[in-house]
Structure formats: C-alpha cells, structure tokens
Design a protein with these regions (language model features):
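N-terminal glycine-rich FAD/FM-binding segment characteristic of electron-transfer flavoproteins
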Residues: 1-109
C-alpha cells in the first residue's frame, strides 16, 4: 500500500503548494508506515521531490499533458492507483487540483 502525491508543476518547476503536500504526505506516511509515491508530469529535475520525502517518483512525459485537463490527468492518476496499489491520494490546494480531486472522486469510487 502506498500514498500518492500529485506534484503540480508549471514551467518545469514544482509549485510550492505541491512540495508542501509532499511534506504532509511524508509525515502521514511515517505515522502509517506507508511509502510515498510522487507523480511528476512533464518535469525533469526531481531533486526537490527527494528532499521533501518521496520514496518513489513516477515520471510521465507526454506532450498531450502540457495543458491541464482534469480528464487526461485523472486517466493517468487512475492508472497509477490501479498499478501501484495506492490507497491514499494527496493533492495540493490549487484550482486545478480541486477540479482534479472532484473528477477523481467520481472515477475512483
């Protein structure tokens, strides 16, 4: 079982709120004795994710994901949830992540 953190980025840099979500996930994972898996979309430098506690990083580079759409992003996350035995998903607090969270809750129920 694992905790998945969607680490939102812009211009190949992770948003501050995504790193805060990852730090929260690390603390939760430590309490629950669970590993932390990060999803990074169209990014190249993962050093910040490792510094903030990621155990595993799933790197998805796809030109169709350069512009955020909850449909496409939720398809990626849903596949990861199935293949990685994810039990908890943590999103940061942004308009895109809030929209994505609502979309995911319908897909994963």
């Amino acid at each position: 079982m694992s905790i998945l953190v969607y680490t939102e980025s812009a211009n190949n840099e992770f948003k501050k709120s995504a790193l805060e979500a990852l730090s929260y996930a690390r603390a939760l994972g430590d309490k629950m004795n669970e590993s932390i898996t990060c999803l990074a979309i169209n990014c190249n430098d993962f050093s910040q994710l490792k510094q903030h506690g990621a155990d595993k990083i799933i790197d998805v580079n796809n030109s169709s994901l350069e512009k955020f759409t909850s449909k496409h992003y939720s398809e990626v996350i849903t596949e990861i949830v199935k293949t990685e035995n994810i039990k908890i998903i943590i999103l940061n607090s942004s308009a895109n992540s809030k929209y994505l969270g609502a979309y995911l809750s319908g897909k994963l129920e």
